[in-house]
């Protein structure tokens, strides 16, 4: 039935401007973007993340986010070079969360983001070395028996998918159980609860809730203050995590799905006429330009919803089509992506964001673009198959 409905919708929109793009065209653009990253920006996957004068280890959240995008690209473009690049990176870091001597006791989710890619590689190769050191880190963390580690919503993206897949890999539910408690604490208790179920959007951390935000911050960030990339982190994390829960009657899956659907409705209403989302979701006038990281993550989440039968295509495929057009327009002739907001925690950080902007770190922005466009390729292929 889902395929029939999608086919009818694709036929009805086949002459519309937004339906003109083909899966192969979107994939070719994704290959171009990724080739720039792998062969121009970061030809050595073991090197530190760098662009704008800052450096960070290449196994923290910035690079981990890139590999989320690369692995999603691999699912639609199964090139061995993607796996070779990922393997060289992971093996160099010994499949650990950090390179320092305290790697086994780190509880900051920024340093655990890479574990999702490690476990995805394990799912492909079945090599235990790809997860055993991350398991040591996770074991030490859950033994602390605290549930308040995720004090900012980015951490949901950095940590939750990896914890859930660690349970799949080890057949031990402790990791998913703890991650669910972390999530619910962030959702309901941290700073009074960071998920506003009335709006369907998340505050980045306790400093931006309606109750706590300061007057000068309201003027600069917008009020209510909902940061595009922050909400994108959560939206994408819910999708990645649901991918690791095969039983859709599972109580955790049902909770994530309910939150996801609230977010999807809210985010759809925030999309700008040009197809993008702005850095401050409910105050687009402050920073009206395109912002790639949030837009890429939202495209991923909405295309995922259609692909998995939880969002109606007639309502959300036009949203995806417009988002793809906006993301495609950000790509330079050589494959470099413009309009990436650099690292930060709020809408005003790294502004202005423009076509020629060079962010302080490029890798995570590329990953957000890739994860969205590759999921959109899956959607376009499903549509093309339904019409054949």
Residue ranges and their predicted role:
Residues 1-4:
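Positively charged n-region of N-terminal signal peptides that target proteins for export
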Residues 15-19:
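Sec/Tat signal peptide C-region and signal peptidase I cleavage site
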Residues 26-46, 84-101, 129-149, 176-214, ...:
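Long, well-ordered core segments of solenoidal/helical folds
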Residues 233-282:
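Oxyanion-binding "anion nests"
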Residues 7-10, 21, 25-64, 72-109, ...:
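CBM-like carbohydrate-recognition segments
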Residues 166-174, 241-254, 307-313:
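Inter-helical turn/loop segments and adjacent helix faces that build the functional surface
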Residues 133, 138-168, 196-243, 288-294, ...:
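The feature captures the catalytic groove of carbohydrate-active enzymes
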